[in-house]
Amino acid sequence: MKTLLLTLVVVTIVCLDLGYTLKCHNTQLPFIYKTCPEGKNLCFKATLKKFPLKFPVKRGCADNCPKNSALLKYVCCSTDKCN
């Protein structure tokens, strides 16, 4: 019984992500992403303001949401692959 309990504990530890890491898209392609470094807790997506289609021109990880510029609108989120 103790062996079974120990096995379950080990399997649980191995399967759990002990240190949560955020995953963000980092290219214009939606199926490519990277794990963000420690301290970067937001994903962002930049789109062109004047372009009718909201195609992302830049994606990545950030510690703070970048400010909008004259050309780019930034949207930030904090869940895996949300950008």
Curated annotation (Swiss-Prot):
CDD domains membership: TFP_snake_toxin
Keywords from the named record: Cytolysis, Disulfide bond, Hemolysis, Membrane, Secreted, Signal, Target cell membrane, Target membrane, Toxin
Species for this entry: Naja atra (Chinese cobra)
Signal peptide: 1-21
One BP term from GO: killing of cells of another organism
Family to which this protein belongs: Belongs to the three-finger toxin family. Short-chain subfamily. Orphan group XV sub-subfamily.
Subcellular location per the Swiss-Prot or TrEMBL entry: Secreted; Target cell membrane
Domain of life where this protein originates: Eukaryota
Summary of the tissues where the protein is detected: Expressed by the venom gland.
Gene Ontology, cellular component aspect: extracellular region; membrane; other organism cell membrane
Magnesium listed as a keyword: no
Function text: Has low cytotoxic activity.
Pfam families the UniProt entry points to: Toxin_cobra-type
The protein's name: Cardiotoxin 7''
Disulfide bonds: 24-43, 36-61, 65-76, 77-82
Keyword presence, Zinc: no
Recorded GO MF terms: toxin activity
Top-level taxonomy: Eukaryota, Metazoa, Chordata, Craniata, Vertebrata
